[in-house]
Design a protein with these regions (language model features):
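Conserved helicase C-terminal RecA-like lobe
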Residues: 269-272, 285-289, 429, 476, ...
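Active-site hotspot residues in diverse enzymes, especially metal/ion-binding acidic/histidine motifs
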Residues: 1-107
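Conserved motor-region signature of P-loop NTPase helicases/translocases
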Residues: 104-175, 338, 344-345, 349-538, ...
Length: 839
């Protein structure tokens, strides 16, 4: 039925794989960050979601649960549906925005226009390799889609068309664009990321790689877990944190991953490291760098052995392994060339050498290869991307032709003038076609401004004043975006805007959000016999207890040394508890009824969110901007918890351990990415410049235009690559190559930020740091200074003073602290509380 309604298909469609409780989208972290559905699977996902909505309409479920008070179990019984399906649909109905209209802030202006002659000419190219250099807002995606439509009109079999992108989101959007006019063709062609395509090759030719048909893919946290037992045996000197090897292992795995981006294996890594050692001579610094690289080579060799033994793959293998296979096997090459006659690549500036080598192996002389990109928007150096691949296109594919799109459909002419002026001095511009864009919209908006406040706090006040003024002029909050280079500054801005009553769409660090910490604290009570998380649980409205009573509970458990969950039955046993505290403990117990060592954490959390704590219902009823953000955060958290790596042990403990490790290694950043349905909320978009790539907004605010704000200082990696590893870095040491890439990437980041706005672009800086010292403006301002307006008066919107409430503690006797304990208090008062006060 879904195929008929959504596609108008009269064909009989039969599927044998139905997943009615699937999430609307995968969690953007771990393995799910890379894996994606193929076109056919993507189509079936849509049908599964259609079927669930058809059978369990969200408005009906909201009525039953919110207004009639039915629990998820009651609703499941009434419909005769599986409980997990009902719970997932209720989570979607209560925590995600109900409005499914187009997002306020993003979307493409150029996509709605008739193709211009340069777009039509580029789309019509046939024959040898072709590179289209497409600046911001020039309609590159429309041109790519038009080329695909042209190939289909020429009679090309859609099954022979391969389209490679650099994100699952881009692949999904491209597939949807094509499916809008030709759903069957969209399902037949292969559209996805380089990593997903590499995995497809591994699956097809697994026997030639000595792998099972479906080898398991592991993420960074699983790789560390795999290596932890091997790590102490390696006799390392420079990377030897045996107390907590995760940090060293993560840094070393980053270096190994970077090597795989260059298709360098462990043996090749060792050769480069040995060459460094041979050249070092008496230079002590050079000798140390070589020794560090040799230690990484040692770990690399052990890692490869473990991956082979356990028949596992990591992300870097998904392109590096297929490259070696295709380059070394004429049979595989011929099979892939026959299967993929037409190859199209989006965002070509983001390819690394492994991706280029894979393309060269598949397309041969480059016939029917068509790529589009912009060297000035190359912002993914950490995964090996380089703007030089745009410059080297004719070298990699001899006889290749290049053209450019020359009309910007997105931005006001004054904004176009600013980013084209900056482009003239960019390193990425040295070997590409000049950026000469005509602004199709002409001059309609205001001159680009640089607003200089006195301090970092005043910068937020200036930002708030500007957003408020524009909103009063009729510009929706959702049409305005704040872009920053770092998440830390975004977090401070989000707090500042919300304190001033300005709705902000920003998740930040998911595991640091209060509502997620509450759920994690409750979850830990399921496995911790001493209930240490009771300190936080006792601050929740339904379970409030004074700290003295919490201490009595913890001391009672410490003395009794009970089994897990024994705390849930002691509310009548603990001496000295206030009546309210006994009642709070008693209210906690039902949440853990039936919980055991095999309980699925998602089942537990979903039950609490919907029924046990009625969080979802409360947030839905409140409905303000803050409640919507809390709901989105909880939905994202539960979506993350749905699918976890396989392993031994108690599922709840494994989940908690993985969360700790993800947070420690900053591998949780993908979880700050909002669900697609959140794009409809009318709130100011706060995002990193990386996250804004491919988006556009009516107004863009760009704070932090100060020294070290943008460009940021280069921080050398703890495990720098060996000399000669990075392609195109001849004559540079590994550290110098990383720095050169960093400097170029910072320019590209600023260029991307400047080119996101349609009508208004406002830059912000501050004259003094928080400690009163003067702060110079960013060096990126100078090249565009003549095009900027500098308001003499910068309006500020002051916010309330945010102060914490001190925790009052009564000591039995005078406490004594060591210098180590005092230092811990200065670094982290909360850790001091848990470690030395609540001991």
């Amino acid at each position: 039925l879904g195929h008929v309604v959504l596609e108008g298909s009269a064909l009989d469609v039969v599927t044998f794989e139905v997943e009615p409780d699937r999430s609307m989208e995968d969690a953007p972290v771990g393995v799910d960050r890379v894996l994606d559905y193929g076109a056919r699977e993507r189509r079936e996902v849509k049908m599964d979601l259609f079927a669930r909505e058809y059978l369990l309409p969200r408005p009906v479920l909201r009525e039953f649960h919110v207004n009639e008070g039915l629990t998820s179990a009651m609703i499941a019984t009434r419909f005769g549906a599986p409980l997990a399906v009902v719970q997932q649909q209720l989570l979607d109905a209560l925590l995600l925005p109900a409005d499914e209209q187009h997002p306020v802030g993003s979307g493409g202006v150029a996509a709605a226009l008739t193709p211009d002659p340069t777009q039509m000419e580029a789309a019509a190219h046939r024959g040898l390799a072709f590179q289209l250099q497409a600046g911001p807002g020039t309609g590159k995606t429309r041109t790519l889609v038009r080329r695909i439509e042209g190939l289909l009109a020429d009679g090309v079999d859609p099954a022979t068309i391969l389209v490679l992108t650099f994100s699952n989101k881009a692949a999904n959007e491209l597939s949807e664009r094509i499916a809008a006019s030709n759903p069957l063709a969209a399902a037949a062609m292969w559209i996805g990321t380089f990593h997903a395509f590499g995995l497809d090759i591994v699956h097809r030719f697994h026997d030639q790689l000595a792998l099972p048909a479906a080898p398991r893919l592991i993420d960074r946290t699983e790789a560390i877990e795999l290596l932890e037992e091997e790590f102490p045996r390696l006799d390392l000197k420079h990377y030897r944190n045996l107390w907590d090897p995760a940090l060293d292992l993560s840094d070393m795995l980053s270096s190994i991953s970077r090597a795989k981006d260059e298709v360098i294996d462990a043996a090749g890594y060792r050769v480069l490291a040995q060459s460094m050692a041979a050249r070092a001579g008496t230079d002590q610094d050079a000798r140390v760098r070589a020794q560090k690289c040799l230690e990484v080579a040692m770990l690399f060799e052990a890692y490869e052995r473990l991956l082979t033994t356990h028949q596992l793959l990591d992300f870097g293998d998904l392109v590096a392994l297929p490259v070696r296979l295709v380059e070394g096997s004429a049979e595989v090459r011929d099979a892939l060339r026959a299967r993929h006659e037409h190859v199209l690549v989006d965002e070509y500036q983001d390819v690394n050498r492994a991706s280029v080598r894979l393309l060269k192996a598949i397309v041969g002389d480059g016939r029917n290869l068509w790529v589009v990109g912009d060297a000035r928007q190359s912002i993914y150096r950490f995964r090996g991307a380089s703007a030089t691949n745009i410059a080297r296109f004719a070298v990699d594919f001899p006889g290749a032709q290049s053209a450019e799109l020359g009309i910007n459909y997105r931005s006001d002419e004054r904004i176009v003038d600013v980013f084209t002026e900056f482009a003239r001095g960019m390193q990425a511009s040295t070997s590409t076609l000049p950026l000469t864009l005509k602004a199709d919209r002409g001059t309609r908006g205001e001159q680009v401004e640089l607003r200089v406040a006195e301090s970092p706090d005043d910068e937020i006040s200036a930002l708030a004043a500007s957003i408020t003024a524009l909103h009063e002029q009729g510009i929706a909050y959702g049409g305005q975006a704040v872009l920053c280079a770092s998440n830390a500054r975004l977090n401070a801005i989000a707090v500042g805007l919300e304190a001033r009553g300005i709705p902000a769409l920003h998740l930040g660090s998911l595991f640091e959000r209060p509502e997620i910490k509450d759920l994690l604290a409750l979850l830990s009570l399921a496995t911790d016999p001493r209930a240490a998380a009771m300190v936080r649980v006792a601050t929740m409205a339904r379970h409030q207890m004074p700290l003295q009573d919490v201490m009595r509970v913890i001391e009672h458990l410490r003395a009794a040394n009970p089994a897990s969950l024994a705390w849930s039955a002691i509310h009548a046993e603990v001496d000295g508890l206030a009546d309210g505290s006994r009642e709070a403990l008693a209210r906690l117990s039902p949440l853990f009824a039936g919980v055991n060592a095999s309980t699925n954490p998602w089942t537990l959390l979903a039950g609490w969110t919907i029924d046990g704590l009625e969080i979802a219902k409360t947030l839905y009823r409140t409905g303000d901007a803050q409640s919507r953000m809390k709901g989105l955060a909880i939905w994202q958290f539960l979506n993350f918890c749905r699918r976890q790596p396989r392993g031994q042990g108690v599922p709840v403990l494994r989940l908690l351990d993985r969360i700790r490790r993800l947070a420690l290694l900053s591998e949780d950043r993908g979880l700050s990415q909002l669900p697609r349905s959140a794009e409809n909320i009318d709130a100011v978009r706060l995002m990193t410049i990386h996250g804004s790539k491919g988006l556009e907004f009516e107004v863009v605010h760009l704070p932090g235009m100060v020294t070290s704000g943008l460009p940021r200082n280069n921080v050398p990696p703890r495990c720098p690559p060996p000399d000669g590893l990075i392609h195109g870095s001849e004559g540079l040491t590994g550290i110098e190559a990383v720095k050169a890439g960093h400097d170029e990437e910072e320019e590209c980041l600023f260029f991307v930020a400047l080119s996101r706005a349609r009508n208004r672009l406002q830059l912000y800086a501050y004259a003094r740091q928080a400690d009163g010292r003067a702060r110079s403006p960013s060096r990126f301002v100078a090249p565009i200074e003549r095009l900027l307006a500098h308001p003499a008066h910068v309006p500020l919107r002051a916010g309330p003073t945010l102060t914490g409430v001190p925790l009052s503690i009564t000591w039995q006797g005078r406490p004594q602290w060591t210098d180590i304990q005092v230092n811990l208090f200065e670094r982290c008062p909360r850790r001091f509380l848990y470690t030395h006060v609540l001991k």
